[in-house]
């Protein structure tokens, strides 16, 4: 149930376009645009590049005898946040890869809104991390 919900969330959310209204509120509009095969292949190569970086982060967790999960957040072709699982090392139940990467990306941007960012993670996010992803307004998730 959670997996199918996250897949649906990812598909819908990745095609969403956020706009600011006159009152300053964000609204989401779902795009029905289809991308060409060339665009899809190009995007696949980009996704593979950043997923390899997320896997490198997961290896750091593995070396610490942690659950090997890694995460990378990208905006405009630049990595702005990285993280790996450190729950046991830090004695912190919130030290998931996604949470760490979101915290670093927000700090780097100086804003909690990660609206134009893509989050790459080596394992489907748990409920806590999925909530954090939604709250931080990440535009796209690749798992």
What is each PLM-predicted segment?
Residues 11-17:
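Bacterial Sec-dependent signal peptides at the C-terminal "C-region" and cleavage site
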Residues 44-45, 52, 81-143:
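Zn2+-dependent cytidine deaminase-like catalytic core
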Residues 69-74:
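Short beta-strand scaffold segments in enzyme catalytic cores
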Residues 75-76, 103:
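A cytosolic small-molecule/anion-sensing beta-strand core signal
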